[in-house]
Amino acid sequence: VTQAVLLGLVQPALCQHLMAHGLPVVGMNAMGQPVAYGEYLDQAVYGEVGKVTAINQDYIQNQLQNGIGVCAPIAISKSGQTLNVNGDVAAAAISRLLEAEKLYLVTDVPGVMVNRHVLNKLTPQKADQLLETQVIKAGMKPKIKAAFDALKHGVKEVEITNELQHSGTNLSVEQFAI
C-alpha cells in the first residue's frame, strides 16, 4: 500500500509541482531499476522498514542527465522485498553516495522554525540546543539529523524549505568545522 501511494500519488504530485515552476524533473522509481538497496532495521519490531545501504549509481546518474531526480523513499532488500525508508535519511544517503554538492530537503514548512520565524542558518551547536529543549521536534528531527549526516559525509550544503523561490534554513560545511 505504501509503495502504491508513494509511486502512484506522492511522487507524481511532487514532480508536477516542480514542473509547474519550470524545473526539468524525472521520476526515478522504475520497478525494473531500483534507486536504492537496503536492509531491514529490525523486521520483528518495525516490519518492512529499512535503511539505505547502497544505490544504483549508474541508473541515477543516467536519469539525472534528464533533470532533477525525484524518488520515493523505498529500497530493495537482497531478497527483493520492498522496504520503506525514512525519506530524509534516504535523501541524505543518496546525496552522500552520489557525492552531491547540495541537498534540498523539501517539507511542509518554510524551514526550521523558532518562535514562528524561519532560521536562515543552523549550526550543529544551535541544532543541538533546539533539539535538547524540544523546540525542534516531530518530523523536523530526522531532517536535521539527515542534513548533518549528509554534511559530515561530503555534501557541502543542505537547504530545508517548502519553497523553490525562497530560501529556507541553510546548513553548510562553511558554517562550522565537521
Region roles according to the model:
Residues V1-I178:
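C-terminal catalytic "cap/lid" subdomain
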